[in-house]
Amino acid sequence: MQVYLVGGAVRDHLLGHPYHEKDYVVVGASPQQLLDQGFSPVGKDFPVFLHPKTKEEYALARTERKSGIGYHGFNFFTDPDVSLEDDLIRRDLTINAMAMDQDGNVYDPYGGQKDLEQRILRHVSDAFIEDPLRVLRVARFAARYARYGFKIADETLLLMQSITQTGELESLTAERVWKETSRALMEDQADIYFDVLRQCHALKVLFPEIDALFGVPQRPEYHPEIDCGIHTLMSLRQACKSNYSLDVRYAVLVHDLGKALTPKDILPRHIMHEERGLIPVEELSNRLKIPTQMKQLALAVCKEHLKCHQAMSLKPGTLWRLLQRLDVLRRPERVEAFINACECDARGRLGLENRDYPQAAFMFKAMQVVRSIKAQDLPAYIQGSEIGEKLIQYRIDALAELKKQYDDSLATE
């Protein structure tokens, strides 16, 4: 029985990239042998076991044969005679098809180290085309390793396009698509994930609302990058640079979906695109089955982002109603996320990536001001239903004073 470290841990070890999970493959053993050593079985479709002490996963070497549609459509075969090479050839990319023994010796039958050195994401074999999930995985790897200069091999991209053409992407469950996409969104260049999906025509299948943005023009005086799709990915890159949460990144990704629905006769203007975007944001979010809180933020950013850009010129009452719609008193963290997403939108423009966004500081201050005014601060003679009315008025008055301070400071600059 031989045990090898495999997959991502070997890849990232050789690359010098941090990793946390370790997976092992066991060659020349039977399930009973592992059970006798105290391993716990956890695999449903094939023999995977947890180490009795470390709880790391150990899988028996196996082969697979396609038997149906989708990433579940495989029959697996495991036997003590299955070799390490047989196990590694079923993997997606050469850089994931390496193994390391307990002495640190690397086994690389399919050229993974060379592709690692040349910064290439290349499929191991033509069996790559049998699993539609690999389109998403390779796109995610492209986003993760872009910092090192990795590119997808031309022949691999062609196979990804072929998978799209088979229609098997539609067999992927919403949960699986979101699992891969949410992980990709948290990479430091998440925009590359969506760019790769577009290159292999998968974006139109899985995210048609986002794909529809490409080729839609915007007014160049506001958006020098012109293309709505490019603006969306530039905005997402800003969210990644600021290391914002998944909620913010998703909201940024979908904030302009309404621009794909703008009547052609008014282009490149996008009047009311915030309202038009609500239905596609709702539909995409429901289809992906994303968490409710994340969807609510995305809808708020879609509907209100122009108000945030205009915050310093809004009337105090209008600003209060905006903060109220954002649930400022109960959910200040959502208002903070909203402001961050709007800032990414403002900076996701060609040549304006580092431009100041004073609206953010103003909105944060406005949030603090209204939250600082509480019922116990009101005069004692104010009672009953009048308390709510007076609280609103006090908050609006405080916002008016804040706006005056900002206006005065701008006038003296």
Swiss-Prot record:
Pfam families: PolyA_pol, PolyA_pol_RNAbd. Residues 228-329 form the HD domain. Signal peptide: none annotated. InterPro entries: CCA_bact, HD_domain, NT_sf, PolA_pol_head_dom, PolyA_RNA-bd, tRNA_CCA-adding_enzyme. GO terms for molecular function: ATP binding; CCA tRNA nucleotidyltransferase activity; cyclic-nucleotide phosphodiesterase activity; magnesium ion binding; phosphatase activity; tRNA binding. Its cofactor is Mg(2+); Ni(2+). Mg(2+) binds at E21, D23. GO terms for biological process: RNA repair; tRNA 3'-terminal CCA addition. Keywords: ATP-binding, Hydrolase, Magnesium, Metal-binding, Multifunctional enzyme, Nickel, Nucleotide-binding, Nucleotidyltransferase, RNA repair, RNA-binding, Transferase, tRNA processing. Coiled coil: none annotated. ATP binds at G8, R11, R91, R137, R140. Magnesium is required for nucleotidyltransferase activity. Nickel for phosphatase activity. Comprises two domains: an N-terminal domain containing the nucleotidyltransferase activity and a C-terminal HD domain associated with both phosphodiesterase and phosphatase activities. Belongs to the tRNA nucleotidyltransferase/poly(A) polymerase family. Bacterial CCA-adding enzyme type 1 subfamily. Catalyzes the addition and repair of the essential 3'-terminal CCA sequence in tRNAs without using a nucleic acid template. Adds these three nucleotides in the order of C, C, and A to the tRNA nucleotide-73, using CTP and ATP as substrates and producing inorganic pyrophosphate. tRNA 3'-terminal CCA addition is required both for tRNA processing and repair. Also involved in tRNA surveillance by mediating tandem CCA addition to generate a CCACCA at the 3' terminus of unstable tRNAs. While stable tRNAs receive only 3'-terminal CCA, unstable tRNAs are marked with CCACCA and rapidly degraded. This is Multifunctional CCA protein. It comes from Acinetobacter baylyi (strain ATCC 33305 / BD413 / ADP1). The gene is cca.
